[in-house]
Amino acid sequence: MSAAVEIQHVHILGAGRMGQGIALAFAYAGLRVTLIDFKERDPAARSAFAAAARGEIVRQLQTQVVFGRITEAQAAETMARIVIVDRERAREGLAEGEIVFEAVPEVMEAKQTAFAWLGEHAGADVLFASTTSTFLVTELQQVVVHPGRLLNAHWLNPAHLMPLVEVSRSDATAKETVERVVALLRRVGKVPVVCAPSAGYIVPRIQALAMNEAARMVEEGVASAEDIDTAIRTGFGLRFSVLGLLEFIDWGGCDILYYASHYLARAIDPRFLPAAIVSDNMREGRDGLRNARGFYDYADVDVPAYLHKRLGEFSRLLDSRGLAPVFNAVSVSVSVSASSVPNQTTLAVSKADYGPR
């Protein structure tokens, strides 16, 4: 098997919040899902947990109904694709399974137990994707029998809504495993990115730095928590939903980041010193758009068309958030006095109310 289109049935090991969100993402896209409650429970507790998990998924679907994204019938159809079972009932289906997303608690012993159990009951061709945000794929591959069939697939919460899934592979991961998982994720509307086995993947690593810096600013009295969050929502966050971080370095010019970083390092802390690659780009003239090379190569790019596209995306985003600049009439009277200095124009400007911003 080589094409993700062949995958029609997804198993998810671990029925907590992340497992429920992933189950909803696949069921919403039309796939059958078996959500496995892996924790040992007595019959009453097992039944209660399954009911609670099902109730939470239904609540998420009802939210989409309220927002007008789906109908009641579509919500019911989505829910009908999800079966919640305990580990005993899951065994038979796993033997004929296609892919398992592991979503048990972030404890290595729990991961080891889960993969040992999967090794006993999953079929020979089943692919494994751990949703861990903590352990490297290289660490998990040490506890599985077939490391070539394992990779990490890190979803962001809420999993059924956030498009990004960070796929982390190692040299031991088979190329076909990566291709099939990436194709499957794209098929259900996700946006997979592939990264090396590195602590924090991409988003959590950048996010941790940004969140800690925001916390430090509160600590230092730079601004209130509310104003910092407003700045992020209406500035930083808006900008980087259209432009990537590295794309923005090229957009403004590497020199801006380079000199700003040195200033902040002197004024605040050496942690702000630029990355070595930023210094290298400065030295080698890879300054971004202005000389057609930076983190990206713009030699064959129609730069005016590219800029127009990005600005259009940004304008539409501002419109959708109610943050677009407000245009109101400005009356301008122009008079030229006979006694005035030649070519001197006197402007009288009265500005109307510009409205809320």
Positions of PLM-derived features:
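Hydrophobic/aromatic beta-strand patches that form the interior of the parallel beta-sheet core
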Residues: 34-36, 83-85, 101, 129, ...
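NAD(P)+-binding Rossmann beta1-loop-alpha1 motif at the extreme N-terminus of oxidoreductases
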Residues: 1-60
